[in-house]
């Protein structure tokens, strides 16, 4: 661990964080998780209004901190958490747009892999293409927990894109034919940072919009009603923490 803290983006000490951090994009969702699911929640970061909290879930320490939007933003926060604060696990909890007929509004997509149109991996100077994938242990645990709560969920590839507004409206058709389930903007960078740091990451997304049916949820719904995804992530953090304590 590099002793480079507090950082320009996280005004905390390593002991302020639990080993597992839940990472929504929206700072208001971070606050929502802390206030509705954690006990003894303490604000540990508010630099640039990126709220971070640590509290207890079923007696186990869990942290939740926002990432902001896009790969550059989650790239900064996840890098600092993995490398400067020695966090072991980051679980992204966010929204995604469905791009497959089998996926429905408010379904959950667990990102086994994350395709991307970003050049984030160029920094590694690899002699080929890198395939960003989730931590198997986190993913396996999340799947078990999703089944236990009876969630409508899917496991497969996400598309992490750099562009929310794309000049070509049909660009997702090419990804759809490869079986990609949903599009979001963060998972690939998170998975690559985890791989490089030899740490663990997982993205659990709730479908907020549908690119085929044009259905959508409101910003308030995205902030306050995607609780099933939050519960799956918290239960995953709980099980992983217990396992590592034994």
Summary of predicted features, one role per range:
Residues 129-178:
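Active-site rim beta-loop-alpha module in soluble metabolic enzymes
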Residues 169-208:
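A C-terminal functional module that forms or caps the active site or interfaces directly
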Residues 66, 95, 112-114, 142, ...:
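Short, structured patches in soluble enzyme cores that scaffold and shape functional sites
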Residues 211-246:
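His/Asp/Glu-rich mid-to-C-terminal helical/loop segments that flank catalytic regions of hydrolases
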Residues 1-137:
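Metabolite-binding pocket within alpha/beta catalytic cores that recognizes anionic/polar moieties
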Residues 141-149, 193, 232-243:
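Generic non-transmembrane alpha-helical segments
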Residues 39-46, 150-156, 241-246:
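Flexible, glycine/charged-enriched surface loops at secondary-structure junctions
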């Amino acid at each position: 661990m590099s002793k480079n803290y507090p950082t320009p983006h996280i005004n905390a000490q390593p002991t302020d964080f639990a080993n597992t951090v839940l990472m929504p994009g929206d700072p208001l969702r971070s606050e929502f998780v802390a206030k509705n699911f954690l006990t003894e929640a303490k604000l540990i970061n508010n630099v640039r209004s990126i709220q971070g909290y640590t509290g207890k879930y079923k007696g186990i320490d869990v942290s939740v901190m926002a990432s902001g939007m896009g790969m550059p933003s989650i790239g900064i926060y996840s890098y600092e958490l993995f490398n400067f604060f020695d966090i072991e696990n980051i679980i992204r909890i966010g929204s995604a747009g469905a791009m497959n007929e089998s996926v429905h509004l408010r379904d959950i997509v667990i990102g086994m892999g994350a395709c991307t149109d970003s050049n984030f991996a160029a920094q590694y100077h690899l002699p080929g293409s890198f395939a960003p994938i989730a931590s198997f242990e986190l993913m396996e645990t999340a799947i078990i927990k999703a089944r236990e709560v009876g969630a409508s969920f899917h496991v497969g590839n996400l598309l992490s894109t750099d562009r929310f507004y794309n000049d070509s409206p049909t660009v997702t058709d090419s990804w759809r034919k490869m079986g990609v389930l949903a599009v979001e903007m963060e998972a690939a960078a998170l998975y690559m940072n985890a791989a490089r740091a030899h740490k663990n990451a997982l993205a659990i997304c709730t479908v907020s919009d549908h690119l085929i049916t044009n259905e959508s949820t409101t910003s308030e719904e995205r902030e306050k009603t995607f609780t099933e995804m939050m519960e799956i992530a918290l239960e995953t953090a709980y099980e992983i923490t217990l396992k590592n304590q034994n």
